[in-house]
Amino acid sequence: MPLVNPHGKDKVLKPLLLSGEELQNEMEKAKSLKEVRLSSRETGDLIMLGIGGFTPLEGFMGYDDWKGSVENCMMADGTFWPIPITLSTSKELGDTLGIGEEVALVDDESGELMGSMVVEEKYEIDKAHECREVFKTDNIEHPGVLQVMQQGEVNLGGPVKVFSEGSFPSEFAGVYMTPAETRALFEKNGWSTVAAFQTRNPMHRSHEYLVKIAIEICDGVLIHQLLGKLKPGDIPADVRKDSINALMENYFVKGTCIQGGYPLDMRYAGPREALLHALFRQNFGCSHLIVGRDHAGVGDYYGPFDAHHIFDEIPRDALETKPLKIDWTFYCYKCDGMASMKTCPHGKDDRLSLSGTKLRKMLSEGEEVPDHFSRPEVLEILKKYYAGLEEKVEVKMHTHAEGK
């Protein structure tokens, strides 16, 4: 059986990353263009456009696509897209740009020239409306809402040419992969059904259990970690990479799973982000996305299984990648092993509730981590990381993390 098709009507990957002489010529031309500075989130989105992770998009969205994505998860041409992919700038710069003008796209943090874009549209948006639709809140305490509210006043829409993947290929060599690379690896392994496990945390026993359930169902699993920016207090990607490698080496059958990484920042959009995670995993060649408790959530903004329910609300043909919906999982002392609400008849006093937030809080505060919470090889790496921190960030517990 072949792998799932890339997303979109054409069913082919559309990487927008230039190479060779064309790249050199376009980079030279871009030196004389007006510069639009990119936020970290926008740079990650541009790189995903470059590697084909956001197939079939050809650039940053114009107004009709923004509106359709925000309100109906649907672009103007009927393509399913659950979160808008947009570029913003100041009104001051926007007023100087003409329709049809080409601009250079520069990462604001590093100053690196990342690409170019033809400005086909300039438009203003109701940011609070976008936040209420996508995040289900306009509270700026929500990190994703804060990102949107801090955007420039004007959105620019148009096709892009991508020049660089930033530091990801060198900084995360062997983990950072393009959709073409993951697809080639799956085919080399003889996999046709592949489940993606989304993670922004080091893997504890519940994560391990979810992946092993998926291995029983599918040919293999892509442990696909986010390599872009997170919120304060989250554990950086290099530490996660080492801890995931330790887990795979000691507790998984060789050849059943692969660790990969992708260049996006977290949006913390909960159910909507779960849909985006499934969409771009389809481009990476994954037939399934593991969706556990509070997928892509933050705080108490979403119910623990809202991300399960949203897949039942979209058109059946919206995505080829399907969710593997897995119930609340935990360690049960009476069962003497990992279990879920579907498999364990015992009460909460017999269960050890596991969460990444709880693990980070215990490690940050120097508390002893209970047996069965995480593997010792993983804890060793995490304890070393926390011991080296000069400044601790308070980790706030929320309802789902406490197992309530």
Swiss-Prot record:
Alphabetized Pfam families for the sequence: ATP-sulfurylase (PF01747), PUA_2 (PF14306)
Record CDD domains: ATPS
Disulfide bonds: none
EC number: 2.7.7.4
Reaction catalyzed: sulfate + ATP + H(+) = adenosine 5'-phosphosulfate + diphosphate
GO molecular function: ATP binding; sulfate adenylyltransferase (ATP) activity
Keyword entries, A-Z: ATP-binding, Nucleotide-binding, Nucleotidyltransferase, Transferase
UniProt pathway: Sulfur metabolism; hydrogen sulfide biosynthesis; sulfite from sulfate: step 1/3
GO-annotated biological processes: hydrogen sulfide biosynthetic process; sulfate assimilation
InterPro entries found in the cross-reference section: ATP-Sase_PUA-like_dom, PUA-like_sf, Rossmann-like_a/b/a_fold, SO4_adenylyltransferase_pro, Sulfurylase_cat_dom, Sulphate_adenylyltransferase
PANTHER family for the chain: PTHR43509, SULFATE ADENYLYLTRANSFERASE
Family recorded in the similarity comment: Belongs to the sulfate adenylyltransferase family.
HAMAP family: Sulf_adenylyltr
Protein name as catalogued: Sulfate adenylyltransferase
Organism: Chlorobium phaeobacteroides (strain BS1)
Lineage: Bacteria, Pseudomonadati, Chlorobiota, Chlorobiia, Chlorobiales
